[in-house]
């Protein structure tokens, strides 16, 4: 696949020789991503994204490769970087580079390399700049607003994948600094109620087990936060036989957790008995040094929120620098990043996974392809919606949700693949409840 007449395009990946391996896995993933493949079939001929120059900053995985090639199939030019220093699958990046698409990503980047990679995506092989942003976590959006504001007048839209990035968009919007129409993909029902919940339900345990080979059954696990991600994590660990404790600030979420049978307590109490800790909040300072010092020997700490601010890794590293602890690298970052910190005064150790970054991507391969198809179909539709309305006033400078009918369409595209047969309303039934026969069926405020 080539996206321009020039066949040799710049890229930076770890090992281009992995391209064949990556291509085989991409072909397998396509069979598990019916939403994206349906968009290719439906829109491939008309090229609705022709002229779009999409800079993407999202985990460079096999599933993302299918997203990238869908955008190209629909007419876009694409450049890509990863939104996390540990999340790239190097064979996926190699396959995309070999396909002639500029990609700048490898597993185990430094923070400086991470910023450099994002910056490379602003320029396209034609010599032109980006005119669309597809973001996950808001780093690309922030870079353009903070460092390259001169580019903003020519950017038609931003689509944002995750909770943390949406929060950053909302902060920009409320402060009057947002300058580009934006779509919050995260809060589409077919993203947050599937990726965040069912994706984490499978990929959390995958990351923990690949990193540690630990048996989960019988252990006390602490899940910090009971939003969609926390729900998926708590139910996953419960299904493995863990006794799950939940910490939560929101009384509604706390009540939900309690009604599901989880013990809801504070970190000050939970830190004394948990053998596994999972942060899911997207906030900062969830697990502090004072908590780590009280944990049982070889307690495992990991994070599945977007940023590395939830576990106070800096405190643990400072303990080592001050001679109060030692650290042993069990696995290097290119195969999972597992570090064991031992405190001199107690002799007890804690094990930190992926250096406090996303454990499911740092220590494993992230969510399964099928659930990512749902998320990424939303992304493609958001890019199409923004780009195709670039010359009218449908979208002003604020943060929008995808229209409900598109949210429902994403779900429809995935039903046949798993054998779902949908009941159809009669006109009389539709009239009775006041909805169209073909939907949308729920108001925007419906929570699912």
From Swiss-Prot:
Pfam families registered for this protein in UniProt: AdoHcyase, AdoHcyase_NAD
Which SMART domains does this chain map to? AdoHcyase, AdoHcyase_NAD
Q: Which InterPro entries match?
A: Adenosylhomocyst_ase-like_sf, Adenosylhomocysteinase-like, Ado_hCys_hydrolase_NAD-bd, NAD(P)-bd_dom_sf, S-Ado-L-homoCys_hydrolase_CS
Q: In which pathway does it act?
A: Amino-acid biosynthesis; L-homocysteine biosynthesis; L-homocysteine from S-adenosyl-L-homocysteine: step 1/1
Report the cofactor remark: Binds 1 NAD(+) per subunit.
Give me the residues that bind substrate, please: 61, 136, 161, 191, 195
What cellular component GO annotations does this protein have?
cytosol
Task: Give the catalysed reaction(s), semicolon-separated.
Answer: S-adenosyl-L-homocysteine + H2O = L-homocysteine + adenosine
Q: Quote the EC number.
A: 3.13.2.1
**What are the entry keywords?**
Cytoplasm, Hydrolase, NAD, One-carbon metabolism
Which GO terms of type biological process are on file? L-homocysteine biosynthetic process; one-carbon metabolic process; S-adenosylmethionine cycle
Keyword Cytoplasm assigned = yes
Has UniProt tagged this entry with the keyword Metal-binding? no
List the cofactors.
NAD(+)
* Location of this chain's protein in the cell: Cytoplasm
**Gene Ontology terms for molecular function:** adenosylhomocysteinase activity
Paired cysteines (S-S): none
So what family is this one in? Answer: Belongs to the adenosylhomocysteinase family.
Q: What is the purpose of this protein?
A: May play a key role in the regulation of the intracellular concentration of adenosylhomocysteine.
Protein name per Swiss-Prot or TrEMBL: Adenosylhomocysteinase
């Amino acid at each position: 696949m080539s996206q321009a007449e020039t066949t040799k395009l710049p890229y930076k990946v770890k090992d281009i020789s992995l391209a064949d391996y990556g291509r085989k896995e991409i072909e397998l993933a396509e069979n598990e991503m019916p939403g994206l493949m349906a968009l290719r079939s439906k829109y491939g001929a008309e090229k609705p994204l022709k002229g779009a120059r999409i800079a993407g900053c999202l985990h460079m995985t096999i599933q993302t490769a299918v997203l990238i090639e869908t955008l190209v199939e629909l007419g876009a030019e694409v450049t890509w970087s990863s939104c996390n220093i540990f999340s790239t699958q190097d064979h996926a990046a190699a396959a995309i580079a070999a396909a002639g698409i500029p990609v700048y990503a490898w597993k185990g980047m430094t923070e400086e390399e991470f910023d450099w990679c994002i910056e490379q995506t602003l320029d396209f092989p034609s010599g032109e700049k980006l005119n669309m942003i597809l973001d996950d976590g808001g780093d690309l959006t922030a870079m353009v607003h903070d460092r390259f504001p001169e580019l903003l007048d020519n950017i038609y839209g931003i689509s944002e994948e995750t909770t943390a990035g949406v929060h950053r968009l909302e902060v920009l919007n409320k402060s009057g600094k947002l300058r580009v129409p934006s779509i919050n993909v995260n809060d589409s029902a077919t993203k947050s109620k599937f990726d965040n919940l069912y994706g984490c339900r499978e990929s959390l345990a995958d990351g923990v087990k690949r990193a540690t080979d630990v048996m989960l059954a019988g252990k006390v696990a602490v899940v910090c936060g009971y939003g969609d991600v926390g729900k998926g994590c708590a139910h996953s660990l419960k299904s493995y036989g863990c006794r799950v404790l939940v910490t939560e600030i929101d009384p509604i979420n706390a009540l939900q957790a309690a009604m599901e049978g989880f013990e809801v307590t504070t970190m000050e109490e939970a830190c004394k008995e948990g053998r596994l800790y999972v942060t899911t909040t997207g906030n900062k300072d969830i697990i502090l040094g004072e908590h780590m010092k009280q944990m049982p020997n070889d307690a495992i700490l990991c994070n599945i929120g977007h940023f590395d601010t939830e576990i106070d890794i800096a405190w643990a590293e400072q303990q080592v620098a001050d001679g109060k602890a030692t650290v042993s690298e069990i696995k290097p970052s290119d195969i999972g990043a597992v570090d064991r910190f031992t405190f001199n005064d107690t002799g007890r150790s804690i094990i930190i996974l992926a250096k406090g970054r996303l454990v499911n991507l740092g220590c494993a391969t992230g969510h399964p392809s099928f659930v990512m198809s749902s998320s990424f179909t939303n992304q493609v539709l958001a890019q199409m919606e923004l780009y195709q309305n670039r010359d009218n006033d449908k979208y002003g400078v604020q943060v929008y949700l995808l229209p409900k009918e598109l949210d429902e369409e994403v779900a429809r595209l995935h039903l046949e693949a798993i054998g779902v047969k949908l009941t159809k309303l009669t006109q009389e039934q539709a009239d009775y409840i006041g909805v169209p026969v073909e939907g949308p069926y729920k108001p925007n405020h419906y929570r699912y």
